[in-house]
């Protein structure tokens, strides 16, 4: 009886192991296609270190990582945009973009559209420059953690007074 359970456990491991090969995320296959297309597997690609991986390893806190990830995702969207006319890799690019949509934007189309809108602004466009400078003070106020804490304390104080009356 003991040997039977070992044999069944072994068979289960083999079945689950073989299923792992077929249950890969779709982006992996498409990323491999892009690597072949761009000869990104060649040894010279590793010269001078990584672009993104070391940066991601340096940041452990979730909010810090999200900031870095947003810049990296922005880079990839710009990169993919430059490939839009190349039909040989279009399927791979679209599959990867869709997977980014699921993983990074939680399938939230509005969030993705706003993100793409931000990454598509041209810093050389005079109207964009003028609007950005016009909004700078408000944007800086939104970035300040002190402003957010002050707002929260005021609203909590107000609620406390109302409850005691």
From Swiss-Prot:
Type II interferon produced by immune cells such as T-cells and NK cells that plays crucial roles in antimicrobial, antiviral, and antitumor responses by activating effector immune cells and enhancing antigen presentation. Primarily signals through the JAK-STAT pathway after interaction with its receptor IFNGR1 to affect gene regulation. Upon IFNG binding, IFNGR1 intracellular domain opens out to allow association of downstream signaling components JAK2, JAK1 and STAT1, leading to STAT1 activation, nuclear translocation and transcription of IFNG-regulated genes. Belongs to the type II (or gamma) interferon family. One of its GO terms (biological process) is positive regulation of protein-containing complex assembly. Released primarily from activated T lymphocytes. This is Interferon gamma. Homodimer. Interacts with IFNGR1 (via extracellular domain); this interaction promotes IFNGR1 dimerization. The keyword Glycoprotein applies. It comes from the Eukaryota. Residues 1-23 form the signal peptide. GO terms for molecular function: cytokine activity; type II interferon receptor binding. Keywords: Antiviral defense, Cytokine, Glycoprotein, Growth regulation, Pyrrolidone carboxylic acid, Secreted, Signal. GO terms for cellular component: extracellular space. It is found in: Secreted. Glycans are attached at residues 48, 120. The modification Pyrrolidone carboxylic acid is found at residue 24.
């Amino acid at each position: 009886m003991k040997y039977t359970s070992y044999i069944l456990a072994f068979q289960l491991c083999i079945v689950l192991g073989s299923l792992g090969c077929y249950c890969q995320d779709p982006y992996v296959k498409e990323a491999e296609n892009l690597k072949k297309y761009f000869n990104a597997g060649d040894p010279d690609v590793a010269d001078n270190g990584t672009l993104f991986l070391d940066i991601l390893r340096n940041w452990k806190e979730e909010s810090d990582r999200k900031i870095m990830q947003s810049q990296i995702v922005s880079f990839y969207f710009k990169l993919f945009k430059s490939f839009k006319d190349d039909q040989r890799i279009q399927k791979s690019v679209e599959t990867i973009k869709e997977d980014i949509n699921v993983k990074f934007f939680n399938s939230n189309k509005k969030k993705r559209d706003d993100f793409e809108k931000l990454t598509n602004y041209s810093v050389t466009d005079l109207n964009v420059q003028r609007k950005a400078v016009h909004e700078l003070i408000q944007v800086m106020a939104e970035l300040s953690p002190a402003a957010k804490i002050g707002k929260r304390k005021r609203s909590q104080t107000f609620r406390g007074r109302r409850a005691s009356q």
